[in-house]
Amino acid sequence: MTNDADVALGIEAARRLAHLGLVDIQPGLTDAEFATIERRFGFEFADDHRAFLAAGLPVWTPGQDDHPDKASWGWPNWRQLDSSSTLHEQVDWPLATALDEIQHGEWPPGWSRRPHDLARRMAKAKRLLADVPRMVPVYGHRYLPAGRGSSGHPVLSIHRLTDTIVYGNDLAHYIDQEFREPRVTVPLWRDYV
């Protein structure tokens, strides 16, 4: 069951993004589109993420998405399910990078003992990862966990399994962190920021 506060958080994030005027925003996703996406990828959007995408589908940030160091993949265009290998790469990235690092020796601390045999290690990792919530792309390498009936999770920047940081306390805070330029008030120094 969806909570009004969860929906409000997603709508507030969408409002903040639209207010900045930096992004091409298409009409929001419909219930039928959500159902198709969720069936295709095997996850359900968290309630705040769903409300955000229902309010409007951000698809491009001129200037920001043109620079590979800033966004890499940019906004996922959930309407290009068949024509975009980029969307599939973006959705698959968290699991792919986790498995890649595990193959090269990394082992999450909470996962008991690491098998020495590579085949056993990878099989065990795949079993354990199957129980971890899927991460759903928000923008570039920024992700929220999947899960209908959940909301308010921190947005994570996932470049690698071992290079994961919190990029926003929640979706609305993330929009401010990623796209709103802070106003520097210190004389002299503000001219050099």
Locate each region found by the language model:
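Glycine-rich, aromatic-bearing surface loops/beta-hairpins
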Residues: 149-193
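Residues in flexible loops and secondary-structure boundaries
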Residues: 51-53, 146, 164
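Short, solvent-exposed polar/charged micro-motifs at secondary-structure junctions
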Residues: 58, 147-149
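A surface-exposed partner-binding patch
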Residues: 1-130, 136, 140
